[in-house]
Structures are given as C-alpha cells and as structure tokens.
Amino acid sequence: MESLFGLQTTTSPYKFLYPFETLCARFSSDRTGSCRACTQTDSKQLGSKSTLILSKTQYDPLTITMKTPTKTRTHNDYTVGWVCALPKEQTAAKAMLDQIHPTLSKPPNDQNSYTLGSINKHNIVIACLPKGKYGNNSAATVATRMVSTFPFIKVGLMVGIGGGIPPKVRLGDVVISTPTDQYPGVVQWDIGKAEKGTNFKRTGALNNPPSALLTALTILETNHEMHGSKTREYMDDLGKKWPKLVPEYTNSDSLKDPLFIQDNSPHALSSWVAISSIFWKMVLSLLGYLLGWSTLAPMHSGAEQATKITAKVKIDGAQKKPGDIRVHYGLIASGNQVIKDAKFRDSLNASLDGNVLCVEMEAAGLMNDFPCIVIRGICDYADSEKNKDWQKYAAAVAAACAKELLEHLQPSDVDGERPVKDVLSDG
C-alpha cells in the first residue's frame, strides 16, 4: 500500500503516475472515486484513511498518464525546402501537407512568405515567388533567403507547372528532372552561344540534386514501373481534405487537350485528311502568291498545324484516357523567356538531342543556389494555343507527385546531407 495525498492505494498491478486529482477530470466530486467515463471502479467512501480499490474488470494493468507536451519547433528543425512560382502552385503545395505548423519569425531582410508543415517525417518550408516576379533570377533570390532563415535545409524541390513537348508528353502529365546523358536534369537553354538561326550551344553546367533525392527518385521510378503512381490517390485525399479545391485542382473531366482526339462520330475528319487539307491550302496559298492573286500567308502557321495533327496521330497510338496521370523522367529546359511557338520549341528540343520533355522559367536559377529536383505538371504545349485552363490541375498533380517522392525520401539519408547553406558557402 502507498499513501497518495492521504489516500491508501494498492500498488500492484496498478500504477499512478500523477497525483490523483490531476489524473482525470472525469472523476466525480462526491469523493466516491467513481469515474463517469468507465464506471469500472469498486470504491469505498473516501476519507483521510479510506482505501481506493480499482478493479481489473476493464484494464489490466491500469496505467493513467498525462499527455506529453508537443515540442516547439525551431528554424533548425526544417530540412526540406519547397519553392513554387505561382500562388496556385503554393495552394496545391499547402493542400498536400499532412500537417500545417505555426509560423516562425524571420529576419527583417527576409521578404519571403513561408508556409510550414510536414509530410511523412519531413518538416517542410514552402516559399512562393513574389506575385508578378517570375523567372530564374527571382527564384534564386527566394531560395537564397530561405536557406539563410532555415539554415538546416538539406534538400530542395521546385514544384509547379510547365510546358510539355509533344508527342511524348501530354497535358496533365508530370515531368521530373532526371540527369540524362551529359545533362544534369535541368538545362538553362538561354545561357550559351548562338550558332545558326535559333540553334545554340549550351555552355557551362548546373549543379546536380543532392544524392538523397536521387536515391528517392530511383525508388520512385521503380515503384511506378511495378505498381503505378500513387498520384491519383493523393489527389483524391486532397479533395477530401479541401473540397473547395476539387472543381479546379483535382477534376480534369471538363478540360480539353488539343492534341487528344476523342471523337467517336462516324463523320469525324481523320487526322490524315486534315493533314492533306492543310497541305493543299499551303500549295494554293503559294500558287496564289506567285500569280499575284493574294499575299502569302505565314508558312510557319501551317507547319505548326501540321505538327500538331501529326502529334495527334502519334498520341492516339498511346491510347491514354482523359484523367490518366503519367509520370516522365528526363530533361527540363529552363530559361527567362516564355515559349509560345511550336517551331522554336521543337528547335530547342532538337538542339538538346531531342531529350527535352518540358520547358519552364524558374528551375535553372535554382540549381546553382538551391540544388533540387524539379517537378512540373504539364499545363500547355508551349505553342500559340498556350492558355491557363490546365494550370491549377497541373499544379495539383505536380504537388501530389512531390508528396509521393517525399514518402520515399528516408530521414536518415537527409540527415547525411550537408545543409545547402554550407554547400553554397564552399563555392
């Protein structure tokens, strides 16, 4: 028997860890010792020398504990940096977090806005570029401030939207930057020397991502081949947690892909007939010009249309259904110029040996200041039909894929990496 605040209590097989009156607010105040929650106690009227006997009817042994206070997180607890360029990309990123953490203070010279949270066992810092300030230089500034304020960030992600290179890549697909041949996963196409026309020769190289991320990427690619992507599962989870986002961020049924032919009508014009029609229009236009009947229409517009329809024919062979999400691994071309021309896009791809899967505007600025993996949801084809219809859905798909990658990133591997701030200080 042990004395506990004047009460005689049995010691075995039961254990009290805290004073009786602080254990459970559910004990009645009539000093009978009965618990309103379980009513499984046999007790006598309590007094200064009474005995409290707890029965073994429900618990054996009975251990009552107090909740351990949650540890207060500091800047040093965050090891993953996640950078996005657009508010819609930040919305998708925040919606993918398992938990959202309270904000922390930041230095006066840090103008970034941060969202803190966690996925799996990783504490994550999300930062978005200032509204209206896009491109490589702005991305580099945001990343530099982030690793200064959160000095133990060791791995980075650049997650958002980009333009796909057909016919390999389709709207709603995901492209993950992966080292390819002599390229480190991301190439800054507008750093180099011009040779002929729009062709150029790339000069210099960008940093590779941390080894921990590349290891996780290998596991992710293997799992995708064997079991398929879990991206759709994470998209569905987002819809359950944030139902207001469903119409634009998780549902692609109402979105149209200009390179996807899904016309079951018996009167539908075949792709080859369409190509033939464009060809004869170009011939007649040239003939009319030579005879002085009309001015010559821009030839590249017809060529772009023919390229699109040819891509349609190739894409049809893949039989991808609307809503399917495919993940591609390969080269991303990054530059400070928006690409909205199919001819230039294809020339750029050809100059990089046909390895380009995606074009975008921020990643190259990060690679030397914030070595990371770039994940892009495809929202357009970087041609004259570029629009914003697919952007929110593509942002959510990219964020879901980033979450899946983090599920395969081992905390022990992250611990083994040096902080990005230290790596950069070494020059």
Q: Regions from the language model: what does each represent?
A:
Residues 11, 29, 38-41, 52:
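Intrinsically disordered, low-complexity segments enriched in serine/threonine/proline/glycine
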Residues 5, 14-20, 27, 59:
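Aromatic (phenylalanine/tyrosine) cluster motif
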Residues 6, 30-33, 47, 427:
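Residue-identity detector for glycine
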Residues 24, 35-38:
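Cysteine-centered motifs
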